[in-house]
């Protein structure tokens, strides 16, 4: 009976949509990564577009595959009440005022905002706001492929469907 349940579970697993394997900021601060960037999703519990990103964009199989393979994906509640350590620095929750944005989210102007960090923890790029999966794939691949060092983003967007997407799809299907 256990064998049959295992076989059924294995078969159903292939039918389930891809999911991003999110990590906590605590896990990320202790992770030893060399060949990936950190992708930090700064969100709040009240943010409607944050929930829409989770529901629509991050559930997209291509988005999930890129994030899981090329980045170290982290979710961080920008209103967290925990003190955290990140790359040798300590960040504390804010206790002043109505907008209690965590010290680690300082500089984030709105939610959702996604920040890419190099492996050493230095910020590379902030990406503010909601984006549908079709647009987010372009943004993620721009950084995952290293094309961010070769082309300005506006040119890259124009090239993507004809010149870059076929290469990306081959790479993702390896």
Residue spans of the language-model regions?
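Thiol-/selenol-based redox modules, centered on thioredoxin-like
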Residues: 130-174
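Detector for the c-type heme attachment site
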Residues: 51-55
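Soluble non-cytosolic domains of exported or imported proteins
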Residues: 37, 41, 57, 130-134
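Structural motif corresponding to alpha-helix initiation and N-cap regions
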Residues: 22-26, 60, 98
């Amino acid at each position: 009976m256990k064998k049959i349940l295992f076989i059924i579970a294995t078969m159903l697993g292939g039918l389930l949509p891809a999911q991003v394997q999110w990590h906590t900021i605590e896990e990320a601060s202790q992770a030893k990564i060399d060949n990936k960037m950190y992708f930090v999703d700064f969100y709040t519990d009240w943010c409607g577009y944050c929930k829409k990103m989770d529901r629509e964009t991050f559930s997209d199989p291509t988005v999930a595959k890129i994030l899981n393979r090329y980045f170290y994906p982290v979710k961080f509640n920008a209103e967290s009440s925990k003190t955290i350590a990140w790359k040798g620095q300590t960040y504390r929750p804010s206790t002043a005022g109505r907008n209690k944005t965590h010290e680690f989210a300082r500089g984030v102007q709105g939610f959702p905002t996604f920040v890419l960090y190099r492996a050493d923890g230095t910020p590379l790029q902030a990406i503010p706001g909601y984006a549908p999966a079709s647009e987010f794939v372009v943004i993620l691949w721009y950084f995952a492929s290293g094309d961010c060092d070769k082309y300005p983003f506006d040119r890259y967007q124009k090239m993507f469907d004809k010149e870059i997407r076929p290469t990306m799809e081959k790479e993702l299907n390896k």
